[in-house]
A protein has these predicted regions:
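Bacterial lipoprotein signal-peptidase II cleavage site
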Residues: 21-27
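C-terminal motif of bacterial Sec signal peptides marking the signal peptidase cleavage site
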Residues: 16-19
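Oxyanion-hole/transition-state-stabilizing segment in secreted/luminal serine hydrolases
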Residues: 67-74, 129, 133-173, 196-199
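Serine-esterase "nucleophile elbow" of acetyl-processing enzymes
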Residues: 28-126, 143-148
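Structural recognition of the beta-strand scaffold that forms the well-ordered cores
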Residues: 57-67, 123-128, 152-158, 190-195, ...
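Catalytic His-Asp segment of secreted/periplasmic serine-dependent ester chemistry enzymes
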Residues: 198-281
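Glycine-rich, flexible loop motifs
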Residues: 281-361, 365-377
Length: 377
């Protein structure tokens, strides 16, 4: 069966760098991509206020998803951001300094910024910091209001990193609830965004909760406190399905969206999905990691890892690597493997790991070995 990924006819489709260097990659005209993005039209007070130009100042609080991590295929360090003249977000007690990402690399936030500025907003601060949790932000919440003591609108998307920062859902709700109460008192419109699913969990990191548990805790917290919220955990996969985009094609490494993923996320934020297609059951797909030392292009489908578990589990699995996988894939690939109970295995490869595109290659496990890669037509 031909595995094909539909491609959005969007100007945001561009060539992304595969390794970060000092020179920023040059995408297709960013202004055109942003100008074509949908406006925030959800049935929310903040959307109506934005449309009538009543929002002059906006603050975004979040982690790497709101920072725009890998939006341009790169992860920009704090020293690089400082050298580029990016805005200083805050300075931690230990002297660590955190800077905004470049404005055109801020993922879904850049689309919100464009709409707000077009409507007359004069202040837009993105205080998202990669790797940080709601628990961390709660401990540093006063530092978010050093430039000004309140904003017209505040958007918050946190929780993904609380899978490790917090031990239980109760602890997470307590920390996040305290942060949101503090923030809500300093704005006219507070909008909470339920974080998107992290479909790849590194095996070397212990998670006390999964993405679904985080999402349910955020919903509960917002429901009890009466906060407006957008359920990106549900709406992002649904929007992907409506647009004909497999969910795995919208991630870079399974945790952070790629450029088209961020565009799809913003579309899901801007307006509710129509629900015209069945959303992908990403929970049924096993993400087996990234750049594993024990997995190569010659690995047999029934090979075991050090714990005695199959490297390729039964069913569908996803694997990412930017190292050489086979001679036909010298720069790595995004791989989807279908392993059946009868031992038959088919593997599809997409050499462009950062953008939705066709699974252009296919191979099969036959007679104790992998066939050569062939065109998937």
């Amino acid at each position: 069966m031909r595995r094909v990924i539909s491609v959005l006819s969007l100007a945001v489709l561009c060539l992304l760098c595969t390794a970060c260097g000092w020179t920023k990659p040059v995408p297709l005209p960013e202004e055109d991509a942003i100008s074509e993005a949908p406006a925030l039209t959800r049935d929310l007070p903040v959307a109506e206020a934005l449309q009538r130009g009543a929002v002059q100042s906006i603050l975004v609080i979040g982690d790497s998803i709101s920072d725009g991590n890998t939006d341009d295929g790169c992860v920009w360090g704090q020293d690089e951001r400082e050298a580029l003249g990016c805005r200083l977000i805050l300075t931690e007690e230990n002297g660590n300094r955190y800077y905004e990402n470049a404005p055109d690399s801020q993922g879904w936030v850049k689309f919100l910024r464009a709409q707000a500025e077009a409507a007359g907003a004069s202040v837009f601060h993105n205080d998202a910091i990669s790797g940080m949790s709601a628990k961390w932000f709660n401990a540093h919440k006063e530092l978010l209001f050093t430039e000004q003591d309140r904003y017209d609108a505040i958007f918050v998307m946190l929780g993904t990193n609380d899978r490790t920062a917090c031990q239980t859902g109760e602890e997470f709700r307590a920390e996040y609830g305290e942060l949101l109460a503090y923030v809500a008192a300093r704005c006219e419109y507070l909008t909470v965004l339920v974080p998107i699913p992290a479909i790849y969990t590194p095996t070397d990191t212990v998670k006390n909760m999964n993405s679904a548990e985080i999402a349910e805790n955020v919903r509960t917290l917002c429901g009890e406190a009466g906060y407006d919220f957008i359920d990106c955990y549900k709406d992002f996969p649904q929007m992907a399905a409506d647009l004909g985009l497999p969910l795995g094609s919208l991630y870079w490494g399974g945790t952070h969206p790629n450029a088209v993923g961020y565009r799809t996320l913003w579309t899901a934020i801007a307006h509710e999905p129509e629900g015209t297609a069945q959303p992908e059951d990403f929970a049924s797909v096993t993400c087996i990691g990234c750049n594993r030392d024990d997995l190569s292009g010659e690995t047999a489908p029934d090979a075991m890892d050090a714990s005695g578990d199959p490297l390729y589990p039964l069913g569908v699995s996803w694997y990412y690597t930017w190292n050489t996988f086979t001679p036909a894939l010298p720069y790595g690939a995004f791989l989807e493997t279908h392993r059946e109970t009868d031992g038959s295995t088919v593997q599809y490869a997409r050499s462009n790991k950062y953008q939705p595109s066709e699974f252009s290659l296919v191979r099969r496990w036959e007679n104790g070995g992998w066939t050569d890669w062939a065109d998937n037509d």
